[in-house]
């Protein structure tokens, strides 16, 4: 049960911190370092300003709120550090053989690096769908994003 709570907290924490990092002042001083990788690869996942590292890994504080085993906190840190590489590979599917493939959510984060204004979170909790920042790569979603960005600016 604690692992499930931790995973949902991590998803929410990532989305909220990521949105915060896209505020103009935070983007300029910290998050722009990460977004130099417009076509990201696994090693670019932790290419961040030190301020962003502090914010990104601050999610481990949940283990002081919901008392948990030290292995849970260790898993949390490993997942945050190593799991982010998987989120930056940019592939939509992993091919099993000629006829089978597994859908990945990594493509969504690739679109985030391409357009900056979409897909701040992952697909486990649909924050992007709820707040109108989701982009699936389709022409319709691209038009919706352009309209939203033009209103914002």
Regions found by a protein language model. Give the residues of each.
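Short, small-residue-biased leader/transition segments that mark boundaries at the very start
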Residues: 1-5
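Transmembrane alpha-helix/helix-exit interface in multi-pass inner-membrane proteins
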Residues: 8-28, 69
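Cytosolic/stromal cytosol-facing helical appendages immediately following the last transmembrane segment
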Residues: 24-153
């Amino acid at each position: 049960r604690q692992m499930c709570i931790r995973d949902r907290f991590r998803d929410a924490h990532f989305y909220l911190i990521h949105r915060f990092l896209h505020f103009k002042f935070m983007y300029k001083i910290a998050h722009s370092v990460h977004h130099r990788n417009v076509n990201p690869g696994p090693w670019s996942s932790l290419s961040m300003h030190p301020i962003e590292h502090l914010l990104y890994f601050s999610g481990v504080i949940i283990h002081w709120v919901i008392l948990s085993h030290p292995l849970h906190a260790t898993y949390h840190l490993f997942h945050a550090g190593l799991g982010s590489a998987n989120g930056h590979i940019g592939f939509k599917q992993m091919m099993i053989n000629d006829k089978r493939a597994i859908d990945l959510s990594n493509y969504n984060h690739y679109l985030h690096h391409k357009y900056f204004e979409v897909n701040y979170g992952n697909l486990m909790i649909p924050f992007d769908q709820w707040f109108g920042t989701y982009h699936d790569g389709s022409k319709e979603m691209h038009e919706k994003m352009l309209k939203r960005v033009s209103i914002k600016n």
